[in-house]
């Protein structure tokens, strides 16, 4: 594929984000590939995985053995099923980096930046949000630390603290989960954010 222009925008001065994707294969290795939009934050290298927007593609042709995965196939040895799969995968990646969808998410981030956190009891905000979104007590401690370090006491700051903490988690699968949880926090209904803040009052 030829080079394409990077899709990027600013959430705030000095805070640039750009469109990306997470591509993962199935655990059993049967030719299933998932493509999920990712918003990459240049400031700290965090990625927010857009939950609910994952697309799956399944390779309908022959599945290679583990040894064959280390071989680069030329166009001559690709089967018709291979070519179809690769074409569909390319289209899925393009769709995942759709500029309109990216702009909508940036607008969501900009809005969250202005949704202040109740600072009367910041640990209570983190604990309540963690309980709502399936973040463990140990992870909550890490999120709290990252939140305080960022000095961004807003809904946007909380979501970024979760994705920043994902970089400290040993399990890749759990880190990926936390990137998705970051988006779920970012996009929570306003009344849920209000309730979380009220509990911490």
Question: What is the meaning of each model-derived region?
Answer:
Residues 2-6:
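Short, small-residue-biased leader/transition segments that mark boundaries at the very start
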Residues 11-201:
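Intrinsically disordered, low-complexity regions enriched in serine/threonine
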